[in-house]
Amino acid sequence: MALLKQFLHLARPFWGGKTQWREWLLLASIIGFTLFSIFMSVKIAAWDKRFYDALAAFDGKAMPTLIVEYCGYMALIIGCIVCGDWLQKRLVFRWRTHLTERFQQNWLGGHKHYRLQLTGEPDNPDQRIADDIYQLADKSIVLFRSFINNIAKFSAFVGVLWGLSGVQHFTLWGHSFTVRGYLVWVALAYSAASTLLAHLVGRRLKDLNIDRQHREADYRAALLRVRDHAEQVAFYQGADAEQGRLQQRYRRILDNWRRLTNCEFRQETFWAAYVRISIFIPIIATLPMYLAKTLTFGDMMQTRTSFARVQDSFGWFTDSYRRLVAWAAVAARPG
């Protein structure tokens, strides 16, 4: 909650200004391109059914029309992605410019930079202005766009998947059960389990990333100190002492790096398994209906696509976990 309050404190002057309508228009355009690309994805899911049914029926006459239709969908989706990315970069730079000017004024106004140098708080203001602000603007916009894309994708495909799931009847321990939309529940259960495991595996990443930024900044500050005081270091023959300080700070980076890479190794192992298992889950889930001939081959392919989209939506936290951790680490530094 404290992190969210700090982020809102940083974002409010830019997004809450009366003259920021251009930025809101940019954001609305980005969302518009995102929503239209989702609409095209729904069209492609319907195309999957027609294409694979025609393929299973060896219907060569339908293929040219279907291929041209698919190329049209792809052209529209690519256009949406490219335009959305271009507008996103413009918006990120506008926000970065606003934050940079604001932080520079706060840092230099009233000789505050001198007083901060004496007290040592906060650490490395140069990094906060030059790097952290850009990372904050970029990661915030990227995550927001990803979240909107996820909500739209879920809203578009959950109804399709529910309808394709039909009504399933099964018996367990002598009791009969009826399940509607069972593929939706399979996607939810798989994503919930994956999200819990992702959090358990990567829960230390945030603190390690924050610590990494501090240690990297301390090392850069020590290097700058040697450069700025090169004459004194040479005159007093302090090269050995400075070398010792630099090595000490670099050893702190190395210690953090070891712990961070160990944590990332566990996270990446989980992620690699998660991605590959996710490919087979929709096939396995729809296989009984296909073998029972309640689904055509085209239905199975459309179900596979819809299942993947819904499962992606449920698993947004898992997919975005590392980006969320990196965003939290960056948002915790400026202030």
Language model: regions and residue ranges:
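Membrane-integrated ABC transporters
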Residues: M1-S41, A46, R50-Y70, G84-Q88, ...
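Loop segments that connect adjacent transmembrane helices in multi-pass transporters
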Residues: R204, L208-T261
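A hydrophobic transmembrane-helix motif
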Residues: S29-G32, F36, L76, C80, ...
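Membrane-spanning helices that line or support transport/gating and their immediate boundary helices
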Residues: W47-A54, W86-R94, H98, R102, ...
